[in-house]
């Protein structure tokens, strides 16, 4: 009888020990999952802060300008096919950043241009600007072009995402306003969209390389993936700052390879 009781106690002891081990393992697993969630949340919040920092209005600083990053927005919704043709539209917005040799912004200017045409509802949503806000803040196209002409310098390299498209729209507007910009056609050029194509990270159904958007190139160069989404911002400012940020990465790569 005593032997039987001892055996039962031994079995109970083993069961209690096994249960304790299992509970400890479950607590450790819960703690690991919680730590992982905290780590992921911290990483996500860090990425959000980084994106917000890159898309925040830069503070003016002194320095020697080496790059002029340019962006234009049209009054009409233009698809990819039209962007590759000679199609032109009055400018809705014109913006630029002057950057130093390392890509740090020295000065940013961005303007909405007052035009007589109407934008479609789809375009208003894309550009993140209501008609009321546009009419209240827009300036004369000639005034914006004049301000651009004042920052053009022979030592600058002209940079844009789809640079040929932006130049075509800009030169068409300059001709309409009779404000010559002869120097801009003489500057060295750097098209970020073409550089993104050569990287080959965006592929079509046939696995051929495709042109990335300004956001896709920005996310690729900064290893961001498709999330989190970009914060709300006027498209003209967003694309300008995305392009400037992408250029900074490319310049840092070039410096490290020297």
Spans of model-derived segments:
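Metal-dependent phosphoesterase signature
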Residues: 126-145
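Metal-dependent phosphoesterase core characteristic of DEDDh/y 3'-5' exonuclease domains
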Residues: 65, 87-94, 98-127, 152-257
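N-terminal signal-anchor transmembrane alpha helix of single-pass membrane proteins
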Residues: 2-24
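Charge-rich, solvent-exposed alpha-helical interaction surfaces
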Residues: 32, 50, 54, 122-125, ...
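Entry/capping segment at the start of metal-dependent catalytic domains
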Residues: 27-102
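Short His-Asn-centered micro-motif
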Residues: 70, 137-138, 160-162
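Juxtamembrane transmembrane-helix termini
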Residues: 21-27, 251, 255
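Glycine/serine-rich loop-strand microenvironments at binding/catalytic pocket rims
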Residues: 140-156
């Amino acid at each position: 009888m005593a032997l039987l009781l001892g055996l039962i106690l031994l079995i109970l002891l083993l069961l209690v020990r096994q249960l304790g081990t299992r509970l400890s393992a479950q607590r450790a697993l819960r703690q690991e999952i919680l730590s992982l969630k905290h780590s992921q949340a911290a990483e996500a919040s860090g990425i959000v802060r980084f994106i917000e920092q890159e898309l925040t209005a830069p503070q003016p600083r002194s320095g020697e300008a080496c790059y002029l990053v340019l962006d234009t927005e049209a009054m009409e919704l233009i698809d990819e096919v039209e962007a590759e043709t000679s199609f032109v539209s009055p400018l809705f917005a014109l913006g630029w950043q002057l950057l130093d040799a390392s890509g740090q912004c020295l000065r940013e200017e961005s303007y909405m241009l007052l035009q007589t045409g109407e934008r479609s509802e789809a375009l208003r949503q894309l550009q993140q600007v209501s008609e009321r806000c546009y009419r209240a803040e827009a300036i004369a196209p000639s005034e914006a072009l004049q301000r651009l002409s004042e920052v053009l310098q022979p030592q600058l390299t002209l940079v844009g995402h789809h640079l040929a498209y932006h130049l075509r729209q800009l030169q068409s507007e300059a001709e309409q306003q009779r404000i010559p910009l002869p120097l801009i056609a003489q500057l060295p050029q750097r098209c970020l969209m073409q550089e993104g194509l050569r990287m080959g990270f965006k592929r079509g159904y046939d696995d051929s390389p495709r042109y990335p958007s300004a956001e896709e190139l920005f996310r690729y160069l900064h290893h961001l993936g498709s999330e989190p989404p970009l914060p709300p911002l006027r498209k003209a400012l967003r694309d300008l700052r995305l392009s400037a940020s992408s250029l900074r990465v490319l310049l840092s790569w070039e410096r490290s390879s020297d």
